[in-house]
Amino acid sequence: MLYYLYEHFHINIFHYITFRAILAFFLSFFITIFIMPKFISWAKAKATQPIFELAPDNHKTKNSTPTMGGLIYITSAVISILITTEFNKYVLLTLLLLVYFTYLGFIDDYGKIKGSSNKAGLSAKTKFLLQWVGALVISYLLIKVGFDTKLYVPFYKYPIFDMGYYAVIFWAFIIVAMSNAVNLTDGLDGLATVPSIFSLFTLGILLYIVGNYKFSSYLFYPFELGVGELTIIVFALIGALLGFLWYNANPAEVFMGDSGSLPLGAVIGFLAIVAKSELLLIFIAFVFIMETVSVILQVGSYKTRGKRVFKMAPIHHHFEMLGWKENKITIRFWIMALITNLIAILSIKIR
């Protein structure tokens, strides 16, 4: 909306991505800050979080905490995005992805609330299938709008090969994997929120580079016209997440629920694809990947050997079972996320 003020009235400041990104940050932050208390008051009576029966004992006290807070911060971010961005093909695809995965998460959350059980809601198979459907459609549309299908690796400036239409499957895998990875990480107060902010900030830098001809040429990144607008989406999400963290910090007044974690992970995966940094996710999303790998190892070991690798998975529960306090686990995971994202940022120049 603001970009079109520049086009029609020549208000030059609205032309700059940096200005609109900062504005998007503040808009989504304050919308979330002001709306969330009203949502929490309503959700205390209508939408509390059912706690998994096998969760550590200290989680039982969280049974009355409202969930679906993700609906508020995603809505705040979308409002901010609609106000501050130029609607190009990448912006529209990102919005479509956000809306689809938020709706999918909402259906799952709603089922759990109505069923009064963490096992209610969508079945794992149904949710997984619907995630793949959405991810495949978005990935296919990304190719149809002419996006480059070459694959790049960290610390190397040239593409290793062109994936062609196989990119649809690879990109869909990235989106689904990240969606579930953030969902698995969202088990402690603030645990998924801050690493998501770090990941988004790193992706914001990468997207700005890929969308800027001078910077992309200097740093040997492929140039993609229009990708720079996604930097604004990144800052809208960061602002919304910081507003959410105000209420999600320990002791949490609200949880993001699948309504927040599924779209958040999906958009991190999608933005990494558009930033030509899919494989750099090993650093950008290290904490999320670590949590996911811990679950894969636990399930695989139990099914093949009848033994568990960890006391409980995802791995943050393992540390809880060892007697670590929730805040200590959360802050240490935040530190890991910060360090690995700094490595990812360093890789921009070391290529």
UniProtKB/Swiss-Prot annotation:
Residues that span the membrane, as ranges: 22-42, 65-85, 87-107, 128-148, 158-178, 190-210, 225-245, 254-274, 279-299, 328-348
Recorded coiled-coil stretches: none
Pathway(s) it belongs to: Cell wall biogenesis; peptidoglycan biosynthesis
One of the record's GO molecular function terms: phospho-N-acetylmuramoyl-pentapeptide-transferase activity
Taxonomic superkingdom: Bacteria
Cofactor(s) this protein requires: Mg(2+)
Similarity remark: Belongs to the glycosyltransferase 4 family. MraY subfamily.
Protein name in the entry: Phospho-N-acetylmuramoyl-pentapeptide-transferase
Organism field: Nautilia profundicola (strain ATCC BAA-1463 / DSM 18972 / AmH)
